[in-house]
Amino acid sequence: MVVEGEITVAAPREAVFRSLSDAPFFASCIDGVRDLKQIDATRYDAMLETRIAYMRFTFRVTVEMSAVSPPETIEAKVEGTPVGMVGRLTASATTRLSETGHGTNIHYAINATLTGKLGSMGQPVLKAKAREMEKQFSERIAAAFAPGGARATA
């Protein structure tokens, strides 16, 4: 399943790159992420709690920043397992930043695969959840860089 989109924020590309490279900030933009722990310079463990259709899931996930090219590109790999059931989540994500006349355009592409019970839920259900999470993420990023936001620049 591929999820792709973009958002433009009123901030310089370098500031946006620094923020998106900051794991605690990035995790705060994703609904349900908790217990973020840094393993080493490029890897993090966390728990992700979410609801898909009528079921609630908790995943143990590891995120690895696989390629970072300041201030343009961040690539990450995610692997995880749902707690208490058989299955697996794997994903790769690429974020590209480009300057615009009014700030920075954030283009993201995520390719995710779910196996086990989750994988059997069907693409329409999973795609709807992915779009919901994408919308929340975009709103939180936009709010952080809006005037008065946590990452607003003067």
Label each region the model flagged.
Residues 5-7, 33-34, 60-67, 90-99:
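Hydrophobic/aromatic beta-strand elements that line small-molecule binding cavities or substrate pockets
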Residues 16, 20, 26, 65, ...:
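Hydrophobic pocket/interface hotspot
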Residues 12, 41, 70, 100-103:
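Short strand-connecting beta-turns/loops that link adjacent beta-strands
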Residues 1-51, 147, 152-154:
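Hydrophobic ligand-binding cavity/cleft-lining segments
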Residues 62, 75-128:
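Beta-strand/loop substructures that line and gate deep hydrophobic ligand-binding cavities in soluble
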Residues 115-154:
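A conserved amphipathic terminal alpha-helix motif
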Residues 38-81, 136:
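Glycine-rich portal/gate segments that line the openings of hydrophobic small-molecule binding cavities
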